[in-house]
């Protein structure tokens, strides 16, 4: 018994000594209940408590995994993986496990959101332009599709690019950022006629409404929990990307939520309780309503050390 306890202690010491604090975490998304955050680091998907702590590695393939998206009930995660060449959609339990492949086209597919009922995953891909499309047919200009979570045939939702989709609770409307041209999405302080805007799409009427319509970059919209306002990322005010907010009844009245100066805020998401999550300078942050940003401490143990065998 003493030998077993000693062995366990040695393993714990080994794990703690090899834990690292990762930088440049990407694709962060907070869970619907606000308790956990998934993120990508060096091509794998991890999960960490929203209060900080040890990160659990969910994928261990030699391929590149990215863009994790929570299901509305927080029990599943959809993500993109290039394990078969191009990026395809996969879905796995939120605690990790066997991933099921959902898409099989040769084009790369990037997940954006689940429908509120949890039955479909929406994704962007350049698969099929309609005959009446006015867009130049190129792989850089995607269409919006959905695929059943249970697997099956994909269906085109929009023939125009619609990225970072976010549904309201009713499922009748969703927000998205557009794409008008081929400008590098990582370019800073871009101003032109092809910068991204935030749009509202009514699924009942098919109406698109431009909510920001300006020369600078506005992107990554998310609904507030009550559905009356929108949080988004913008480079307005001659600064780096920060979090902003406007009421849907008055989208021209925009207020700043964060005021970071040196680096851009990326990968905005929100929980059902209104906790914001994003990355800044390669690290994770959360922010409660009417509160200051809080850095999330992340301890990451490489998977080779988590598979140690006791003597």
State what each model feature region is:
Residues 33-35, 73-75, 117-119, 170-172, ...:
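Short coil/turn segments that connect the beta-strands within blades of beta-propeller domains
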Residues 20-22, 40-46, 54, 59-65, ...:
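A flexible loop/linker signature enriched in serine peptidases of the S9 family
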Residues 31, 40, 71, 93-94, ...:
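Short, acidic, Ser/Thr-enriched surface-loop or helix-capping motifs
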Residues 49:
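Periplasmic/extracellular electron-transfer cofactor-ligation site
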Residues 2-7:
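Sec-dependent signal peptide recognition
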Residues 21-34:
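Short N-terminal segments immediately surrounding and downstream of signal-peptide cleavage
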Residues 10-18:
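Hydrophobic h-region of N-terminal signal peptides that target proteins for export
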Residues 29, 69, 113, 166, ...:
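Conserved beta-strand position repeated across blades of beta-propeller domains
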């Amino acid at each position: 018994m003493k030998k077993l306890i000693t062995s366990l202690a040695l393993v714990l010491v080994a794990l703690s000594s090899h834990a690292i604090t990762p930088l440049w975490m990407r694709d962060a998304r907070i869970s619907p209940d606000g308790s956990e955050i998934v993120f990508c680091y060096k091509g794998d998907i991890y999960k960490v408590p929203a209060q900080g702590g040890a990160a659990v590695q969910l994928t261990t393939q030699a391929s590149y995994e990215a863009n994790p998206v929570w299901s509305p009930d927080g029990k599943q995660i959809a993500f993109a993986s290039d394990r078969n060449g191009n990026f395809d959609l996969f879905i796995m339990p939120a605690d990790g496990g066997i991933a099921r492949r959902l898409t099989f086209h040769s084009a790369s597919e990037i997940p954006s959101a689940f429908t509120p009922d949890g039955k479909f995953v929406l994704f962007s891909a350049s698969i099929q332009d309609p005959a009446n499309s006015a867009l130049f047919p190129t792989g850089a200009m995607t269409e919006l599709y959905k695929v059943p979570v249970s697997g099956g045939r994909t269906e085109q939702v929009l023939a125009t690019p619609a990225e970072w989709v976010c549904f309201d609770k009713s499922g009748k409307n969703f927000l998205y950022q557009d794409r008008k041209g081929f400008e590098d999405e990582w370019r800073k302080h871009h101003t032109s006629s092809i910068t991204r805007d935030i749009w509202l799409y009514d699924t009942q009427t098919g109406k698109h409404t431009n909510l920001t319509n300006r020369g600078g970059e506005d992107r990554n919209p998310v609904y507030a929990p009550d559905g009356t306002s929108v949080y988004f990322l913008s480079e307005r005010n001659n600064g780096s990307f920060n979090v902003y907010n406007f009421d849907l009844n008055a989208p021209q009245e925009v207020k700043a939520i964060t005021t970071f100066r040196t680096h851009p805020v990326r990968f905005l998401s929100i929980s059902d309780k209104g906790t914001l999550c994003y990355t800044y300078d390669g690290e994770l942050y959360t922010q409660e309503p009417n509160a200051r940003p809080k850095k999330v401490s992340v301890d990451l143990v490489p998977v080779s050390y988590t598979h140690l065998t006791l003597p």
